[in-house]
């Protein structure tokens, strides 16, 4: 079968035509080779209220922020400080949010307006969230920057925290250059992406508009949900290609499933953003809050062996309708195959071991690490390889090893290379000769998976090289 190259360009835009976003470099706010210190000073009365009557409030209490590293220090006054999270607000090791511009308009710390400090009280390894973001970035997907820090509040050491970049207008400006003024919707629990009617009020408690709040416009979002749920099977693929970053999402979904992030959209209808890019009107999917992953479990489900192609919960129209299209199911499985194969042959364990070594001295003196589940320092040291029991069904590396082995046996490539949308047209690309795998990565011959040979006349041919 010979296919016009422009179909590949349309279906694999982030690979063959350049992705529409960038990942900014780390700076002093996100140090990778040391554990910086954050010191928060607030009045004791305010701290008592913050941790007491105001625990479930998002009210910011005024304070002073000081940041200390081996080569850099800075102090910002009149910042806002509060508890963050959902169920984790009940934890002994709570998460916190710092808002640098809450009381001083335009105040930033190293280009960021807000800082999320995640306690990771469920995770004895303290590495699950970090590893999730690391893999999103490795897979060239949109991800927050992150770093480990030591947190002090009124001189009391509160433990090791993961500093996670906040998703807001500053986040968009650093990733969508000259295309950052669109609507950003934050989806919390209940976000199944079903159509709930034309009234915007029906959506606002679950899908919070985080940018352009004055216009308060949900019209394009509601139209997208209406179309996602109600278009015919024949019209669905072309609509999605015009209005949603399909390949980016299929790649994100593959990552979400591989890491066992059940607290995201596909299983728990939770924890994601949708951003509508002004330049093309397309929505793009962004993950956040990825700490419940890599074998953390409250449902009695074996996430390390769960079927990759039947992993999601029911009543998820975005996942179900996309994977009902044979072409998209193949693209999804090709992403899974590539990611699992890369993990199988990479040195990811040494990356995790190095990060564990970086933070271990800070964990040793973290008394809050022990307060929620009785974790001991010894549990941290074996957190990569051994399960803790209870809700921690796998060590992080133990989970990955098991997921790679089981996952490679669950790949389901149909081999259907017909484009999902055949009415889009595009001029043929410039002359090119190369071999790519099914998701557009230049490669050598591999056995038992589809490969695409691209010719200098703008056509392409699918081949299979069978193993023994």
Task: Please tell me what each predicted stretch does.
Residues 1-21, 421:
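Bacterial Sec-dependent N-terminal signal peptides
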Residues 19-125, 131:
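Conserved NTP-binding catalytic cores of kinases and kinase-like/nucleotidyltransferase enzymes
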Residues 20, 27-28, 35, 46, ...:
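Middle-to-C-terminal accessory/interaction subdomains
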Residues 97-105, 119-120, 139-144, 156-259, ...:
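Internal "kinase-insert"/substrate-recognition segments embedded within catalytic cores
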Residues 410-443, 468:
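Residue-level detector of functionally pivotal "anchor" positions at catalytic/ligand-binding pockets or at interdomain
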Residues 450-468:
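C-terminal tail/sorting-segment detector
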